[in-house]
């Protein structure tokens, strides 16, 4: 068989369950560098679309790389359709975005994609910053999230700081955070999972709050003191995997949190500064 025939036979194209759009590092375990192996451990096929390509996170003493140019980024997305690789697509997840223009490009692609995939699950992790660091993305990204991605998402996973930025509301206590999350719900946006919500410091607990139109569920987990990066990316990878494997939202959130704790403890046992995935036990 000639190579020309082989590579133009779209019936032979690889298919993805998930397209994951976020950062990638050469060294380390953040963004798609941790999300992709975590998703694959769950038996799902995933295509990774980078928004930034970095040598490593900026926490090291040397750091190289930057945002993917818009022309490349739009080409990566377009190529997935040109290869006919999205026939079985079930979900798109987003994490760290490099520029506001990337967010607009992605939103346009998702809008077109949904015409062929009306049941597509779009889950957005609106990476903006945190309480300790403040905003650590470009200043025009929060508005781009509000304008372009939130109207398309079925679920979002902000931390408390990001929820405050997106809503303009104070979220430092549980009731106000829940009210802020509910203000974002719409006919499209069905749920908000607030990560790193206020927990019980004395009992070494952290809380994840699952907010939908008709329910609020507070899930408590043990707090692990660590400076490890990529735990939020891992959480989202586990969450989307659980949902696609048929878990109910609250159960998927609970299991994702437990898996993150397991990975953090395993990483600490192996004295690594970067997350290490242990084998995934069948659940």
Curated annotation (Swiss-Prot):
Stored InterPro entries: PdxK, PM/HMP-P_kinase-1, PyrdxlKinase, Ribokinase-like
Subunit structure: Homodimer.
Chain residues that bind Mg(2+): 136, 162
Signal peptide: none
Family: Belongs to the pyridoxine kinase family. PdxK subfamily.
Reactions catalysed, as given in the entry: pyridoxal + ATP = pyridoxal 5'-phosphate + ADP + H(+); pyridoxine + ATP = pyridoxine 5'-phosphate + ADP + H(+); pyridoxamine + ATP = pyridoxamine 5'-phosphate + ADP + H(+)
Binding site for substrate: 23, 59, 233
Function text: B6-vitamer kinase involved in the salvage pathway of pyridoxal 5'-phosphate (PLP). Catalyzes the phosphorylation of pyridoxine (PN), pyridoxal (PL), and pyridoxamine (PM), forming their respective 5'-phosphorylated esters, i.e. PNP, PLP and PMP.
Listed name of the protein: Pyridoxine/pyridoxal/pyridoxamine kinase
Phylogenetic lineage: Bacteria, Pseudomonadati, Pseudomonadota, Gammaproteobacteria, Enterobacterales
Binding residue positions for ATP: 125, 157, 162, 195, 221-224, 231
Pathway: Cofactor metabolism; pyridoxal 5'-phosphate salvage; pyridoxal 5'-phosphate from pyridoxal: step 1/1; Cofactor metabolism; pyridoxal 5'-phosphate salvage; pyridoxine 5'-phosphate from pyridoxine: step 1/1; Cofactor metabolism; pyridoxal 5'-phosphate salvage; pyridoxamine 5'-phosphate from pyridoxamine: step 1/1
Domain of life: Bacteria
One example GO MF annotation: pyridoxal kinase activity
Family matches, as CDD domains: pyridoxal_pyridoxamine_kinase
GO terms for biological process, alphabetical: pyridoxal 5'-phosphate salvage
Entry-linked Pfam families: Phos_pyr_kin
Cofactor annotation: Mg(2+)
Assigned keywords, A-Z: ATP-binding, Kinase, Magnesium, Metal-binding, Nucleotide-binding, Transferase, Zinc
Entry GO terms, CC: cytosol
SUPFAM superfamilies: Ribokinase-like
EC number(s) recorded for this UniProt protein: 2.7.1.35
């Amino acid at each position: 068989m000639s190579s020309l025939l082989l590579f133009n036979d779209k019936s032979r194209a690889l298919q993805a369950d998930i397209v994951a759009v976020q950062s990638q590092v050469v060294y380390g375990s953040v963004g798609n560098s941790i999300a992709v192996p975590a998703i694959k451990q769950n038996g799902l096929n995933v295509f990774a679309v980078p928004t930034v390509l970095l040598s490593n996170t900026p926490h090291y003493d040397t750091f190289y790389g930057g945002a993917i140019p818009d022309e490349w980024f739009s080409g990566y997305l377009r190529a997935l359709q040109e290869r006919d690789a999205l026939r079985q697509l079930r979900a798109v997840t987003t994490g760290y975005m490099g520029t506001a223009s990337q967010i607009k490009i992605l939103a346009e692609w998702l809008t077109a994609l949904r015409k062929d995939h009306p049941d597509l699950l779009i889950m957005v992790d609106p990476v903006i910053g945190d309480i300790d660091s403040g905003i650590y993305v470009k200043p025009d990204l929060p508005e781009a999230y509000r304008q372009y991605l939130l109207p398309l998402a079925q679920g979002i996973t902000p931390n408390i700081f990001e929820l405050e930025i997106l809503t303009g509301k104070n979220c430092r206590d549980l009731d106000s955070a829940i009210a802020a999350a509910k203000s974002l719900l719409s006919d499209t946006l069905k749920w908000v999972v607030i990560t790193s919500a206020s927990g019980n410091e004395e009992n070494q607990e952290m809380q994840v709050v699952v907010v939908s139109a008709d329910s609020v569920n507070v899930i408590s987990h043990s707090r692990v003191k660590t400076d490890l990066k990529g735990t939020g990316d891992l959480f989202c990878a586990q969450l989307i995997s659980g949902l696609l494997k048929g878990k109910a939202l609250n159960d998927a959130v609970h299991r994702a949190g437990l898996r993150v704790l397991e990975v953090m403890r395993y990483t600490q046992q192996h004295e690594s500064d970067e997350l290490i995935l242990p084998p995934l036990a069948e659940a």
